[in-house]
Amino acid sequence: MSLPATFDLTPEDAQLLLAANTHLGARNVQVHQEPYVFNARPDGVHVINVGKTWEKLVLAARIIAAIPNPEDVVAISSRTFGQRAVLKFAAHTGATPIAGRFTPGSFTNYITRSFKEPRLVIVTDPRSDAQAIKEASYVNIPVIALTDLDSPSEFVDVAIPCNNRGKHSIGLIWYLLAREVLRLRGALVDRTQPWSIMPDLYFYRDPEEVEQQVAEEATTEEAGEEEAKEEVTEEQAEATEWAEENADNVEW
């Protein structure tokens, strides 16, 4: 698929995709994913063509931007590594997020409280989000999916080939997708200027690591306060000694 020069993959974005291991696919290749294979490593891991990934990502962004009401786009991730990315994508683009378990019947059973009638569905993994894809097929809702080389492509209308198992890869794809959607909508006018939002915001963070980091910061602050108190105490002691010496000199 040939793209206008404006949509060409920049060296900076290519470096981001490679740094996040977006190009590392599975050992097995599904028949519909064969056009996206660039090469195979000696250890059996297939390498995904990053150019194909970018082309499909731009195509998906153009589809999303064509929907007038952003809330009619539903972003889904049952996979833990993609839940933070889905929430950030929805916050920046106005889409409706479903992070966590997808309630069966959300697209087909209008009696349920979680019933929705979207015009487009985006999923992180066709396997973990199989229920959402299946229900979308029942009511003729187009589906965009982040697919690995061994992912099933049944009922998927637009497949973005990438590593959908790594937390950095998933977060980066959602980040780039959100950025391209905002550019197409005109929210980001200048394509030559970088987006003020960093990709790290879309990456999954382990709650235990966050708690440990907060605890370390608190410990560092306490240590700094203790050092400051010790310095103040030493200064007070020096001032007291100096005052006593001056008093002795005056008496003499």
Curated annotation (Swiss-Prot):
PROSITE patterns named among the record's database cross-references: RIBOSOMAL_S2_1 (PS00962), RIBOSOMAL_S2_2 (PS00963)
Subcellular location: Cytoplasm
Keywords, in A-Z order: Acetylation, Cytoplasm, Ribonucleoprotein, Ribosomal protein, Ribosome biogenesis, rRNA processing
GO cellular component: 90S preribosome; cytoplasmic stress granule; cytosol; cytosolic small ribosomal subunit
Post-translational modification: N-terminally acetylated by acetyltransferase NatA.
Sequence positions bearing N-acetylserine: 2
UniProt KW Acetylation keyword: yes
GO molecular function (one): structural constituent of ribosome
Protein name, entry field: Small ribosomal subunit protein uS2A
Taxonomic path: Eukaryota, Fungi, Dikarya, Ascomycota, Saccharomycotina
